[in-house]
Amino acid sequence: MEPIIKVKDVQYCTLQCPDLDIQEQFLIHFGMHTVEKTDEMLLMKGDGTQPFLEKIIKGEKKFISNAFVASSMDDLEKISQADSFGDIEELSTPGGGYVSKGKDLDGFGVEVVFGIQELEKESAETIPTNEGRKVNRMNQMKRFLKGSYPRILRFAHCGLNAVDPQASFDWYQNLSLIHI
């Protein structure tokens, strides 16, 4: 079966959490940075070009959705016509763009987005490494600052919890949200 659309990547996840302050501190220690915070919503980003990686809404603790990037506006329009997806809406989050929201077979949110503007790439200080017989760093210690956190560059994968794994696999593959 030919997939309905072509998906390029994953973009962000949306979670619901009762305490945004605790979640913000956890994600900062995890290696993310605060983009925007209100009493009801928190947006966090990494060091890469995605405007945000995680959207947290205040409320009872639960998973809301994963967002996938359509290959084109035409693909976003196609997916918006699929049974479990809605009309295209303009995103009000950093980077703008458009979204069609739907639900998978287990009732979890699935967002398909297009047109989100990436940020300019930030340059990161790289520490040379020695590889095999190639010596790029001689007599120099490679030290990390005390308390330094990991660098999160991008939202690159997501997990799924399914009642019927094969049916969910087929559903996501039909939308080209997973590839084998």
Where on the chain are the PLM-derived regions?
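Conserved active-site alpha-helix within GNAT-family acetyltransferase domains
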Residues: 21-30, 166-175
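A structural feature that tracks compact, well-ordered secondary-structure segments
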Residues: 15, 54-57, 67-69, 111-113, ...
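Catalytic cores of nucleotide-enabled group-transfer and carboxylate-activating enzymes in metabolic
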Residues: 9, 16-18, 23, 35-37, ...
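Short, structured motif recognition centered on aromatic/hydrophobic residues
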Residues: 10-13, 32, 44, 63-67, ...
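N-terminal beta-strand motif that seeds the catalytic metal site of vicinal oxygen chelate
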Residues: 1-21, 65-66, 124-166
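Vicinal oxygen chelate
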Residues: 2, 8, 16-21, 39, 45, 84-151, ...
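Conserved small/polar residues in nucleotide/adenosyl-binding loops
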Residues: 178-180
